[in-house]
From Swiss-Prot:
Annotated compartments: Secreted; Host nucleus
Signal peptide from the UniProt entry: 1-21
Role summary: Effector that suppresses plant defense responses during the early stages of pathogen infection. Suppresses cell death induced by effectors and PAMPs in plant hosts. Interacts with host acetyltransferase TAP1 and causes TAP1 relocation into the nucleus where it acetylates histones H2A and H3 during early infection, thereby promoting susceptibility of host plant to P.sojae.
Family per record: Belongs to the RxLR effector family.
Pfam families in the cross-refs: RXLR
Subunit structure: Interacts with host acetyl transferase TAP1.
GO cellular component, one term: host cell nucleus
Written domain comment of the UniProt record: The RxLR-dEER motif acts to carry the protein into the host cell cytoplasm through binding to cell surface phosphatidylinositol-3-phosphate.
Protein name per Swiss-Prot or TrEMBL: RxLR effector protein Avh52
InterPro entries reported in the protein's UniProt record: RXLR (IPR031825)
Source species taxonomy: Eukaryota, Sar, Stramenopiles, Oomycota, Peronosporales
Organism, scientific name: Phytophthora sojae (Soybean stem and root rot agent)
Residue numbers covered by motif RxLR-dEER: 50-68
Region (Nuclear localization signal (NLS)): 87-98
């Protein structure tokens, strides 16, 4: 809350000082006269044309945008499909069971190997 108040105060003070920097009377000569900038010669080329950046306007392909939007909608609907979610759940469950069975087999193999070593030692 304090930060907001401080920012509002700083902005208000800035506007207040910039608003009173120049007098607004008609007699005052403090205003800036209209004229060319001293460095305006830098922006003119040999053909007396101004050197401005040119920005190419993008050609909008509405069909492509439409296809993209329908593709996003299609992906969202696929994610919400309960049948797909159930299939995914059972696939993940089968993978987990396979990993657990592999770990149990490895544990059994380790126990078998340890028993064999123990029996040979005795």
């Amino acid at each position: 809350m304090r930060l907001t108040s401080i920012l509002v105060l700083v902005i208000a003070a800035t506007f207040h000082t910039t608003g009173t920097a120049l007098t607004l009377t008609k007699d005052s000569k403090a205003g800036i006269a209209n004229g060319d900038s001293p460095a305006s010669g830098d922006f003119i080329d040999a053909n007396s044309a101004r050197l401005l950046r040119r920005v190419e306007k993008d050609k909008v392909d509405y069909e492509q945008d439409e296809q993209r939007s329908f593709g996003a909608l299609k992906d969202a609907v696929k994610k919400l499909n309960p049948v797909t979610a159930v299939k995914k759940f059972f696939k993940q469950r089968a993978r987990r069971k396979k990993v657990i069975q592999t770990a149990r087999n490895a544990d059994d193999n380790l126990a078998w190997a340890m028993r064999k070593v123990y029996n040979e030692a005795n």
